[in-house]
Design a protein with these regions (language model features):
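Active-site donor/metal-binding and catalytic loop motifs
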Residues: 163-170, 396-412
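Short beta-strand-to-loop acidic/aromatic patch adjacent to the donor-nucleotide binding site
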Residues: 263-276
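A recurrent flexible, glycine/aromatic-enriched loop bordering the glycosyltransferase active site
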Residues: 329-357
Length: 633
């Protein structure tokens, strides 16, 4: 695999990497989580780490300071030990809470636990005074359906300081080598900051043997002074690679390919470049993966970057017939304030997003590398493929990173091409597509876009269906050509451009009134309303505009009432101007009908083609070709 660009820090010889990525001698006890009491920066509330239940107390990253009569516990998002997940998925039968204390007077330390209903109980407790350490143990034999463990401390007779809190278990025979793979594209500062967060935690770094930074951009992270500082600190642990832009799929796959070519017994931790990283999450994922009897994909949860208290979902699954990822798994919390709520019941994932996700090299050896999908659905497809081969995916609670909220990104975007195309490919590979059900859903969502004057979005989705119908060859170049052409084609549709809100008057030559949405159509009348809106748009029997429509009200069934609407972009960065255009409506409607006829006719045979092509598309040889910049083979 070739590299391009000038030599710079992060160039490491294969022999050094081979020596580093070897199994390590196991300690007597393995640390599976550390006690942290504040977040990685001021934007993150400390209540996600430790809760001051009563009295006065002060929290530091690795220490708690309690005044007399104060009570503090770690019954929090990052403070809880996920007992149910360890009992279900690992060989661990007992966990030990260990901490150091300095008590000026009598104090009490408790090991507390909960069940699947959230009922709390005391597992063990001890009275302390002076200076020393505490060790409290719990058997993991009562947490199958849910429940967690946490520490509680009470400064009874005077001030109390707690430090060096660790959750430990009996170590496995050896510790697997571990590498992080960060994929980046023109987010140089974000990537450098993520790298700095990992490098700044010595405890985490001690358990990582290599960090691969795969740079696919033109604004390279290697040019940043911070990167140079980190590179000097990391030395031979840092591997910096340049390659053509193959999207997140190609960036992450490069890391997986590099590590698995050295050893088939390693943990590869994929990590986005633009997250707010909690380094402790790396330690927790890696420790958990060392304890599973079967190689297991172990993923972190996603917390919201703008609203750091909120969790996207406890665990996710995909609805393939409806082409929908991000469905909440049974019992899963979703869009939840994790200061107020706790995950009581264990919830099992079907897949995990690659914002931070550990993939064992044994899985790669067994099922191959990811598909060259560029972006979107690659993580879903890979876990489905691994699951079919007997390798589960676990989304680990109390291991999370902060990632930009998806609802702040407008649906009408070039990436929607890959969402639709890759969802169809995934469904073809891992389900028996009912062309009637899936075809009806596709027709509906594209018609909704056409009738609500989002012609560029409709074109984007139709193009995705058309390319799916081309068969496996659509994946041959890794997706770069499709990304470029879809962007160029979308530029022909005026409503795909976002304008500053202050220009609304200039755009419309007036000050349009705001028109909020009414009620959602009754499910029983949904298709009737859709047909009616389509007829009215076709005949021009729409309400004259312009009108202003907030993003929260920009539903197809509302926007399609008008012939001219200024709609707030979901990013809140500006507005889109939507205008009825009968010629575009007519052209796109005809393309849609043609594409769906072909979809119903060709999909059964296409499923066989995609399945037959999977081994070659996910092969090391195919990916090396793409890494080397050969789009045609």
């Amino acid at each position: 695999m070739s590299e391009r660009g000038p030599a710079m820090p992060g160039q490491v010889s294969p022999d050094v990497l081979k020596h580093a990525l070897t199994e390590h001698a196991a300690p007597e006890r393995l640390v599976v989580a550390r006690g942290l009491f504040t977040g990685p920066n001021a934007a993150v509330t400390d209540d996600l780490y430790a809760r001051i239940a009563s009295g006065r107390a002060h929290r530091e990253r690795y220490a708690l300071h309690l005044e007399k009569s104060a009570t503090v516990d770690t019954n929090t998002y990052f403070g809880r030990f996920p007992a149910s997940y360890f009992q279900r998925w690992t060989t661990v039968t007992e966990v030990q809470l260990k901490l150091a204390f300095e008590a000026s007077g009598r104090a009490r330390v408790l090991l507390r636990g909960s069940d699947s209903h959230g009922n709390a109980r005391t597992i063990a407790s001890t009275e302390v005074d002076g200076t020393g350490t505490v060790e409290l143990s719990a058997q993991l034999n009562e947490f199958m359906d849910g429940g967690a463990l946490w520490m509680e401390c009470i400064a009874v007779g005077g001030p109390l300081k707690i430090t060096d809190l660790e959750w430990t278990v009996a170590a496995p025979p050896s510790i697997r080598p571990a590498a992080i793979a960060i994929c980046t594209f023109n987010r140089a500062d974000d990537c450098a900051n993520t790298l700095a967060a990992i490098a700044g935690d010595k405890g985490v770094l001690a358990g990582i043997d290599a960090i691969y930074v795969v740079d696919q951009g033109t604004d390279c992270v290697g040019t940043r002074p911070l990167f140079g500082e980190i590179a000097a600190q990391l030395g031979d642990k840092l591997v910096y690679l340049r390659q053509p832009n193959l999207g997140g799929s190609g960036g992450f796959t490069r890391g997986m390919c590099e590590v698995s070519s050295i050893t088939e017994h390693a943990n590869v931790i994929l990590m986005d470049d633009d997250i707010l990283c909690e380094p402790e999450t790396v330690l927790r994922l890696n420790a958990f993966a060392n304890l599973t009897p079967t190689p297991t994909i172990v993923g972190a949860q996603m917390l919201f970057l703008k609203n750091p208290r909120y969790l996207l979902a406890g665990a996710e699954e995909a609805n393939l017939p409806r082409l929908k990822p991000g469905r909440w798994a049974p019992n899963s919390l979703h869009n939840s304030d994790m200061v107020k709520h706790k995950q009581k019941k264990r919830t099992d994932a079907q897949y995990n997003g690659w914002w931070s996700c550990l993939i064992p090299a044994e899985v790669i050896a067994a099922v191959g590398l990811p598909l060259p999908m560029f972006i979107k659905w690659d993580d879903v497809e890979y876990s489905l493929r691994a699951g079919a081969a007997g390798f589960p995916t676990v989304t680990l609670p109390n291991a999370g990173v902060w990632h930009a909220e998806f609802h702040w990104k407008d649906l009408d975007d070039w990436t929607h091409y890959f969402i639709v195309r890759n969802s169809l490919i995934t469904a073809a590979l891992h389900s028996d597509i009912d062309v009637s059900v899936t075809g009806t859903i596709l027709t509906r969502v594209i018609a909704e876009a056409i009738f609500s004057m989002r012609y560029g979005l409709a074109h984007t989705m139709i193009r995705a269906v058309e390319d799916f119908l081309e068969g496996p060859s659509v994946l041959a170049d890794g997706g770069g050509a499709a990304a470029a052409s879809v962007r160029a084609e979308r530029s022909e549709y005026a409503e795909t451009t976002t304008h500053p809100g202050v220009e609304t008057g200039e755009l419309t030559s007036t000050l349009p009134p705001t028109r909020p949405a009414g009620f959602l159509p009754d499910k029983r009348r949904y298709y009737l309303v859709l047909a009616k809106r389509g007829v009215y748009q076709w005949l021009g029997r729409t309400i004259p505009g312009p009108v202003m429509i907030p993003a929260v009200d920009a539903h197809w069934w509302h926007v399609s009432l008008f012939d001219y609407a200024v709609v707030t972009d979901a990013s809140q960065a500006g507005v889109r101007v939507l205008r009825r255009d009968k010629q575009k409506l007519k052209k796109l409607s005809r393309r849609l009908m043609k594409a769906m006829r072909q979809f119903r006719k060709q999909t059964p045979s296409l499923q066989a083609q995609y399945r037959a092509a999977l081994p070659e598309l996910s092969s090391r040889e195919n990916w090396v070709r793409l890494f080397n910049g050969d789009p045609t083979g």
